[in-house]
């Protein structure tokens, strides 16, 4: 598990509220339930956009359930480490990947649906940690998932993939 302190991707390091991390995977940040996030996101600079829902270092004591992200500029939901579970999530027509995790997220994903059009990204982009000495690199449990892509007419050829797994 990542135990250092990091900054949320895209937010300047001078912004203290963008810092996350630590050693408490049981952290409870409250409840996020029955939420629809629509037409969100923002392009801060080249290759630096805001996700529909960013979960950075959020602990397993937090409840995230029945979430919809629709037509976001970048990823629908992205995790940066942490151990929060996300159940009953629908991500549709986003500009990049539907479900994207990085930096050794260690939670549960269950009952997910991704629907992308020809301009969207993959159903999932799943990465572990870039630290070569971190074990396990990534160990979430993901079940009951459906990815529906844009088909063979996607604008970006690599977006034909339902899922990309690295690290």
Report the location of each language-model feature.
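Beta-strand/loop edge motif enriched in small/polar residues
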Residues: 1-167
